[in-house]
Regions:
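Short loop/edge segments at beta-strand edges and connector loops
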Residues: 142, 481, 653
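Residues within well-formed alpha-helices
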Residues: 221, 290-294, 334, 410, ...
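Ligand-recognition elements built from short beta-strands and adjacent flexible loops
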Residues: 476, 541-661
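A generic alpha-helix signature
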Residues: 217-221, 447, 451, 455, ...
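Residue-level marker for well-ordered alpha-helical positions
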Residues: 124, 224, 289-292, 354, ...
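Periplasmic/cell-envelope proteins involved in peptidoglycan metabolism and beta-lactam response
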Residues: 1-264, 280, 352-366, 375, ...
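Beta-lactam-recognizing serine transpeptidase/beta-lactamase-like catalytic domain environment
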Residues: 69, 189-201, 214, 240-285, ...
Length: 661
């Protein structure tokens, strides 16, 4: 036994060693085969620091290349929890500079396992204060801030972005996948003692630029006149849409109340709503143009046919409908000019429900237009089988149907261009490193024939010369149009309100070679609520300024004493609008870039904005940093303030500098 004892001991040792080595090998095999990814990731986490580089969003331009939305690189502050030895002290010091609770900052640092962002997009002054503290583990990385240099101008169309640079409205949202770009990455390598020894960077790809069909100068004119009438009429909301009838391009889309996308959080969802595409309304008498189009094209009437308007009332399937005033015998031309409901209904009854329904569909009613803006409303046109016996009477005068401003302006443009319904468009081009295809668009279609369109333009000219649209008459240009005054549905009763209206005016100018179509809509104006009284003067002021800016030749003699217009004695004649606007673009670009460079030498942009001055000249101050309403109150109403053309830029530059902060 004593001789076998050493052997046994060696055997035991050998067995234990084999088992131990087997266990080690098994464990190593397990870790290698089943836990490799987990431990490799942990090692990378200890050795690497990865930061995402936010891409530069693409610039949004107007049709002439003027910048409407830009991005500016700014510093964000980060803290590395490994290098911050005293989170409490660091948080206390940073809280003073960042104006954030120290407890919140300390919690962020203590709970982080990798570098954590403490605050985004700081002003240069704040960055300098923090940099002077020389805090170990605190560093800066560049991130981009979206800036809208014109503030309220075109805000509803442009939209806005959230704190993470994601498009949240308008073009920013609709074309976000093109505009936002692709993030980059920065990877920093560290050794076992947390000493950084290598840095690798994958650059961010900037987003594509977007060129809109909007003309910034025309947009300014539209917003200026819209805001002025909103102030005078105390309407709830207002919309102006201006279109090129030859191709469907939208030249201006203005909505009130306005909002500033640089500070979008201050405004309600209603304020940020683009009513031109999302808010459907009953059009009232502007819809009579479509009723007439169907009847004229089918040959059931002609402009000179006489209609008995029955002294102002008609019974349709048991429903009594009253005119706004009693009429006797009127020609079809005068039925439209005087906006007789009874006469229009009788014409629709001759046309018949099936053909009338087809006409409305031909003009795009009840259908999406496909305009490149989010949240488009198709409006309401019930299928023919769902009509009641009295529906044709209601539809003929723009009731029991709802439309968006973009739908109506497109229908009016079809009359203007000879009968072709072009899908409205607001995106002209997407600019990238390689050619980028535009989102799919609908095809133009024939809404009516050219003869009917020409007849309707002549009838609509009578509305302006002799009918309900006299206040829309232009100086030096022919104009055709149609007013609309539609009762609103009272949500409490489900019936038409006796004192709440949509007042609108849709117009074409000039008549024979139309350059623009313009739609003006006001929701619940106080006092004068008829479309011709409220919308007509706005059409007149906008059309005269826009046609002059576009260098459209006069097609009728101008009247003497043209320094002021008849509907707004304080409003100047814009004969030199084009030259002044072009001069403004050059001057304001240099001024705006100087203001940006003062805060951030890497960022450049332009902010041309036009304001109309006194008499027959157009004066152009730098209005960046001011609201449209502020411009109106301080410049437009009082002609005597011509000195605004040479106003100091101090306030404007200070406003933009404050924006960067």
């Amino acid at each position: 036994m004593e001789q076998r004892s050493p052997r046994l001991r060696w055997l035991v040792v050998w067995v234990v060693a084999v088992v131990w080595m087997g266990a080690v090998l098994a464990r190593l095999s397990y870790l290698q085969l089943f836990c490799y990814s987990e431990y490799f990731a942990k090692a990378q986490h200890q050795q690497q620091r990865v930061f995402e580089i936010s891409p530069m969003r693409g610039v949004i331009y107007d049709r002439k290349g003027r910048e409407l939305a830009i991005s500016i690189p700014m510093d964000s502050v980060f803290a590395d929890p490994v290098d911050v030895k005293d989170p409490e002290m660091v948080a206390r010091l940073l809280s003073r500079a960042l104006n954030l609770p120290a407890e919140e900052l300390e919690t962020k640092i203590r709970e982080a396992s990798k570098p954590v962002r403490l605050a985004k997009k700081l002003s240069p002054e704040t960055v300098e204060r923090i940099d002077d503290m020389n805090l170990k583990g605190v560093f800066f990385e560049k991130e981009n801030r979206r800036v809208y240099p014109q503030h309220e101008l075109l805000a509803h169309v442009l939209g806005w972005v959230d704190v993470d640079e994601k498009g949240m409205g308008g073009i920013e949202h609709e074309l976000d996948k093109w505009i936002r770009g692709r993030p980059g990455r920065v990877m920093v390598m560290a050794d076992g003692k947390r000493r950084f020894y290598d840095r690798r960077e994958a650059a961010a790809d900037p987003g594509a630029g977007v060129v809109l069909t909007i003309d910034e100068t025309i947009q300014y004119i539209a917003e200026k006149e819209l805001a002025l009438t909103m102030q005078q009429s105390h309407a709830h909301t207002g919309t102006v849409v201006i279109q090129d009838p030859s191709n469907g391009a939208l030249l201006a889309v203005a909505t009130a109340p306005a909002f500033d996308p640089n500070d979008y959080g201050k405004y309600s969802d209603d304020d940020r709503m683009d009513r031109a595409v999302t808010a459907a309304y009953e059009p009232g008498s502007t819809f009579k143009i479509i009723t007439m189009a169907g009847a004229l094209e089918d040959g059931v009437t002609n402009p000179d046919e006489l209609v008995d308007c029955q002294e102002g009332s008609i019974l349709v399937a048991g429903r009594l409908i009253h005119d706004h005033k009693p009429f006797g015998i009127l020609s079809v031309r005068d039925v439209l000019a005087q906006s007789s409901d009874v006469g229009t209904i009788k014409i629709a009854l001759k046309l018949g429900a099936p053909r009338f329904y087809d006409t409305m569909r031909d003009f795009g009613i009840g259908q999406l237009t496909g305009v490149e803006l989010p949240g488009e409303n198709r409006g309401l046109l019930r299928p023919l089988e769902n009509w009641t016996p009295s529906s044709i009477g209601s539809l003929a005068i723009g009731q029991e149907v709802s439309v968006t401003p973009v739908q109506i302006i497109s229908a009016i443009s079809a009359i203007a261009n000879g009968g072709t319904l072009y899908p409205p468009r607001i995106v002209q081009e997407i600019r990238g490193g390689t050619p980028i295809a535009l989102p799919p668009r609908g095809e133009p279609k024939q809404a009516t024939d050219s003869k009917t369109a020409a007849t309707l333009r002549e009838m609509m000219e009578s509305v302006v010369l002799e009918g309900t649209g006299k206040k829309a008459k232009l100086n030096g240009y022919t104009a055709a149009g149609k007013s609309g005054t539609a009762q609103k549905i009272d949500p409490n009763t489900g019936r038409y309100s006796p004192n709440q209206y949509f007042a609108s005016f849709a117009g074409i100018a000039p008549v024979n070679e139309p350059a623009v179509t313009i739609l003006v809509v006001f929701d619940s104006p106080v006092g004068q609520h008829f479309g011709g009284d409220t919308g007509g003067p706005v059409f007149e002021r906008i059309a005269e300024q826009v046609l002059a800016y576009l260098d459209v030749a006069h097609d009728v003699p101008t009247q003497p004493n043209t320094q002021t217009t008849k509907n707004n004695p304080g409003q100047p004649n814009p004969n030199n609008a084009r030259a002044a606007a072009e001069t403004a673009n050059t001057e304001n670009e240099a001024r705006f870039q100087a203001a940006v460079a003062q805060k951030n030498p890497d960022a450049q942009s332009s902010a041309p904005t036009v304001a109309f001055g006194e008499e027959d000249a157009v004066t152009v101050p730098d209005m960046s940093g001011q609201t449209v309403r502020g411009v109106i109150e301080g410049v437009v109403i009082d002609q005597a303030k011509a000195a605004v053309a040479s106003a100091s830029l101090t306030e404007s530059d200070a406003s933009f500098a404050a924006l960067l902060c």
